[in-house]
């Protein structure tokens, strides 16, 4: 028997599940081509522009980073050179300070030695002057005492200046001679 289903099947082939109809393929191809043209014409240039912008930004960033790195390296080298120069200068200053300190110490020592020699010479001169003054004073006093004693022993006045001066000089010479003999005797 012939049923409508069988009639249709006899006149046409049944549609395939895997293969669509020809009109679907044509319309799908037309839509695909239209979409491809629209994307190619409008979207793709924007994507390329965006990618080019990103590429330029990345390249610019890399270039800036390389410049910054080069500047940092140059600054580091300059600072290292300045540091080495500063250390060398500090060493020179330290050495100059040592030399100056040695020279100043020598100068102060020389000045102190000269001052000590001057003070010693001045003190010796003062001592010698005071000794001479004491000798003169003692000679005068001893002379007076000797004349008074001699006047008392002799019983006559020794007012004659020449005689009294000669007597005093002889007495003092005897006194110095006995003192010198006492020193040489005690030294041996």
Curated annotation (Swiss-Prot):
Keyword Membrane on entry: yes
Chain ranges passing through the membrane: 19-39
Membrane topology annotation: Single-pass membrane protein
Pfam families in UniProt: ATP-synt_B
InterPro entries with a match to the protein in the record: ATP_synth_B-like_membr_sf, ATP_synth_b/b'su_bac/chlpt, ATP_synth_F0_bsu_bac, ATP_synthase_B_chain
Keywords assigned by UniProt, alphabetized: ATP synthesis, Cell membrane, CF(0), Hydrogen ion transport, Ion transport, Membrane, Transmembrane, Transmembrane helix, Transport
Location(s) in or outside the cell: Cell membrane
SUPFAM superfamilies: F1F0 ATP synthase subunit B, membrane domain
Gene Ontology molecular function: proton-transporting ATP synthase activity, rotational mechanism; proton-transporting ATPase activity, rotational mechanism
GO cellular component assignments: plasma membrane; proton-transporting ATP synthase complex
Principal location class: membrane
Presence of the UniProt keyword Cell membrane in the record: yes
Family classification: Belongs to the ATPase B chain family.
Function noted in UniProt: F(1)F(0) ATP synthase produces ATP from ADP in the presence of a proton or sodium gradient. F-type ATPases consist of two structural domains, F(1) containing the extramembraneous catalytic core and F(0) containing the membrane proton channel, linked together by a central stalk and a peripheral stalk. During catalysis, ATP synthesis in the catalytic domain of F(1) is coupled via a rotary mechanism of the central stalk subunits to proton translocation. Component of the F(0) channel, it forms part of the peripheral stalk, linking F(1) to F(0).
Self-association state and partner proteins as the record states: F-type ATPases have 2 components, F(1) - the catalytic core - and F(0) - the membrane proton channel. F(1) has five subunits: alpha(3), beta(3), gamma(1), delta(1), epsilon(1). F(0) has three main subunits: a(1), b(2) and c(10-14). The alpha and beta chains form an alternating ring which encloses part of the gamma chain. F(1) is attached to F(0) by a central stalk formed by the gamma and epsilon chains, while a peripheral stalk is formed by the delta and b chains.
Name recorded for this polypeptide: ATP synthase subunit b
Gene that this polypeptide is encoded by: atpF
């Amino acid at each position: 028997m012939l049923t409508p289903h069988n009639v249709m099947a006899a006149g046409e082939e049944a549609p395939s599940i895997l293969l669509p109809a020809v009109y679907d393929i044509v319309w799908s191809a037309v839509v695909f081509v239209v979409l491809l043209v629209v994307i190619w014409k409008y979207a793709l240039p924007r994507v390329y522009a965006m990618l080019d912008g990103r590429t330029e930004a990345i390249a610019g960033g890399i270039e800036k980073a390389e410049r910054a790195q080069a500047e940092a390296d140059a600054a580091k080298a300059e600072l290292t050179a300045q540091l080495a120069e500063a250390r060398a200068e500090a060493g020179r200053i330290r050495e100059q300070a040592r030399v100056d300190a040695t020279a100043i110490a020598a100068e102060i020592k020389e000045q102190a030695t000269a001052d000590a020699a001057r003070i010693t010479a001045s003190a010796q001169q003062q001592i010698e002057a005071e000794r001479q003054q004491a000798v003169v004073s003692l000679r005068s006093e001893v002379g007076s005492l000797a004349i008074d004693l001699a006047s008392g022993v002799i019983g006559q006045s020794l007012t004659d200046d020449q005689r009294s001066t000669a007597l005093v000089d002889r007495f003092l010479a005897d006194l110095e001679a006995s003192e010198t003999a006492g020193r040489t005797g005690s030294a041996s």
